Amino acid sequence: MIKKFDFLIIGGGVAGMSYALKVSQSGKGKVALVCKTSFEESNTSKAQGGIASVTNLIVDNFDKHIQDTMIAGDYISDPVAVEQVVKGGPAGINDLVKWGVNFDKKENGEFDLHREGGHSEFRILHHADDTGFEIQRGLIEA
């Protein structure tokens, strides 16, 4: 049996799955998502750290995050790419939350942000010590 799709996405980690969800939800066509093992076995699911994103504009901003990233990259990172990724971070976090990913929160409902190496502010979103597993779980269920 021949199956026809408008989009073929190869890779079942956060990049492939999030793109598949966006395309599918846009209604622009049928999506096929393939991976070499199972969706639960992606590299994303093994990531333990967190995701850096500006979420609290009272104490943090894009310029600080860009500067931290350029310093951590010994100023050889492409500044245009760094700016694009940093400024796109909040929208990416919003998408993950919309798709059901649960990041740790404080009692007041705000994200429980951490500060890790290379960051001058608390901007690391996480889920216990298995952030990647939680992201993958949320994407699979979405």
Model region roles, listed by residue range:
Residues 30, 35-142:
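Conserved N-terminal/central alpha/beta ligand/cofactor-binding core
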Residues 2-5:
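Core beta-strand elements of the Rossmann-like FAD/NAD(P) dinucleotide-binding domain
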Residues 7-33:
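N-terminal Rossmann-like FAD-binding beta1-loop-alpha1 element of flavoenzymes
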